[in-house]
């Protein structure tokens, strides 16, 4: 019913003209990189980086019941989400497993859900399944907007170059219409699970091209870089940010993925509520998302299971990358709760290859 691919090929070609190198992964054209891994990761951690979020999808809800409907079927409270406010929520199955994590943006006359492209089909089908007599109309709006993320400690100052005081006037977890040299776009300021600040730009195609061209040509004294999936993946692992589909999928629940802060325990029923409540009450959480450090450089495409000292399978590596900051291969993975402690050693195994890896608290610090 709902297609996976929402890649805007024209925007991809625009970024290729700016130096992007692309690759096809699971039927989605992704931007791998623009420059070296070191340069892009440096901008993410120390400067300002801009990423084209074409691995995210944009779902639109219209109708008078939209907010109330979201409140009823997802984990977070939506009833008091005001116009131009932003809030993350989780769609969970009857078993309390993650179907998808979405960022909800309230435009008043409609609502946008920003969700991972690989969970888009499941989220849209799940929403569609429960629209029964509600004034809610569901559609894929990925073709209407382009989404960009600006991240790094210099982000706010950098944006002030182009948007003036408007960049400073957007409060946390909200958005507003901004004009920069006659180019209109929506600017959102977000705080993630670790308190890290980032900005989203939502713009129509031609305005997006003008804005980004202006940024690339007038970056001033800032350590600005366009970044691709490779460096952004390193940044996510370093900061312990679970991603779709590696960590956020229906094998795991919000407790295990460490996104339980997106569950409002004071609100009424939602799908999966009873299971999630019991997990906490009866201490039934079996595993946790952890960081892991490898002792040697390995191919980041390799798949590893985790074993205890008796060779019992106790977990799995879900994301793996080389970190220029840590100067090691680091990973995210799910590990048996009793072993998910800083400094614990477990064995990572891939076929005939095995090595000891160390559990690391998240986020990683140099």
Regions found by a protein language model. Give the residues of each.
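Acidic, proline/glycine-enriched N-terminal capping motif
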Residues: 1-88, 92-99
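Glycine-rich, small/acidic residue-mixed loop/short-helix segments
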Residues: 1-11, 102, 235, 253, ...
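Glycine-rich, acidic
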Residues: 2-37, 136-289, 313
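Helix N-cap motif at beta-to-alpha junctions
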Residues: 64-65, 116-121, 153-155, 204-209, ...
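A glycine-rich (often HGG/GG-containing) alpha/beta subdomain
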Residues: 66-106, 153-192
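Short amphipathic alpha-helices in soluble, non-transmembrane regions
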Residues: 73, 126-129, 161-164, 209-221, ...
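A generic, well-ordered mixed alpha/beta core segment in the N-terminal half of proteins
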Residues: 103, 114-122, 126-139
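A generic structural motif
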Residues: 111-113, 197-203, 327-336
């Amino acid at each position: 019913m709902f297609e996976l691919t929402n890649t805007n090929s024209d925007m991809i070609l625009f970024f290729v003209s700016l130096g992007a190198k692309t690759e096809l992964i699971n039927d989605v054209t992704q931007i791998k990189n623009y420059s070296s891994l070191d340069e892009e990761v440096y901008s993410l951690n120390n400067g300002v980086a801009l990423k084209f979020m074409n691995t995210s999808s944009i779902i639109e809800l219209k109708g008078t019941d939209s907010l109330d409907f979201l409140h009823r079927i997802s984990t977070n409270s939506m009833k008091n989400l005001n116009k131009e406010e932003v809030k993350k929520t989780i769609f969970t199955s009857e078993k309390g497993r993650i179907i998808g994590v979405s960022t909800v943006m309230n435009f008043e006359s409609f609502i946008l859900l920003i969700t991972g492209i690989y969970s888009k089909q499941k989220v849209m089908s799940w929403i569609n399944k429960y629209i029964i007599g509600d004034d809610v109309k569901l559609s894929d709006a990925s073709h209407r907007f382009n989404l960009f993320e600006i991240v790094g400690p210099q982000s706010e100052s950098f944006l002030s170059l182009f948007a003036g005081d408007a960049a400073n006037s957007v409060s946390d977890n909200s958005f507003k219409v901004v004009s920069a040299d006659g180019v209109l776009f929506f600017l959102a300021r977000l705080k993630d699970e670790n308190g890290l600040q980032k900005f989203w730009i939502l713009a129509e195609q031609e305005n997006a091209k003008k804005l980004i061209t202006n940024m690339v040509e007038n970056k001033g004294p800032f350590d600005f870089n366009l970044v691709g999936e490779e460096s952004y993946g390193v940044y996510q692992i370093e900061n312990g940010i679970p991603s779709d589909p590696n960590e956020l999928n229906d094998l795991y629940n919000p407790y295990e993925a460490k996104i339980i802060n997106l569950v409002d325990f004071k609100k009424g029923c939602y799908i999966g509520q009873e299971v999630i409540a019991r997990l906490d009450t009866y201490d039934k959480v079996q595993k946790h998302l952890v960081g892991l450090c490898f002792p040697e450089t390995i191919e980041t495409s390799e798949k590893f299971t985790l074993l205890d000292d008796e060779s019992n399978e106790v977990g799995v590596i879900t994301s793996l990358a080389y970190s220029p900051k840590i100067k090691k291969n680091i990973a995210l993975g799910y590990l048996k709760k009793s072993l998910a402690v800083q400094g614990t050693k477990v064995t990572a195994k891939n076929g005939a290859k095995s090595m000891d890896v160390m559990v690391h608290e998240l986020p990683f610090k140099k």
